[in-house]
């Protein structure tokens, strides 16, 4: 009973961590990486389609992404989608699309850092909410006399250790992201 509660809670915490990683991958650091364009939707025969389904996105060099459409007729639509995605990117179009990364100004770096801190805080809150749910489940079991008081305290300590581990992981990922952002 307790084991299932802990496993379920830890799985939810892991998903929160994965969501944070996904969000962090979209925050610009001045270096090119394909994940930056993962949220771009292209109008493909009347329906919005993720960019990675109509083109391959590769890193050409540390400051340039190379977008190669599977269908040559999609070049203009992909170019338009990247420009309208509000990422501050200005693609250059030929047979393939080159997306140079503009250098980040100090102000932009600070804004990106604030964004990263905000996302990390949201993840911490989410982890704490999961902990609260787990603790409530444990207290409910103790209230119904399905587990002993000792088991309740032991489970509470374990849940707190799991929570601390995930909060620490979030903090370390945030500090890594901040150092990436502030390195020129």
Curated annotation (Swiss-Prot):
Q: Which Pfam families did the record assign?
A: RRF
Q: What does this protein do?
A: Responsible for the release of ribosomes from messenger RNA at the termination of protein biosynthesis. May increase the efficiency of translation by recycling ribosomes from one round of translation to another.
Organism for this UniProt entry = Psychrobacter arcticus (strain DSM 17307 / VKM B-2377 / 273-4)
Recorded protein name is Ribosome-recycling factor
Q: Which family does it belong to?
A: Belongs to the RRF family.
Q: Can you name a GO cellular component term?
A: cytosol
The answer to whether UniProt assigns keyword Protein biosynthesis to this entry is: yes
Matches recorded under CDD domains: RRF (cd00520)
Q: Where in or outside the cell?
A: Cytoplasm
Task: Work out whether the entry's keyword set contains Cytoplasm.
Answer: yes
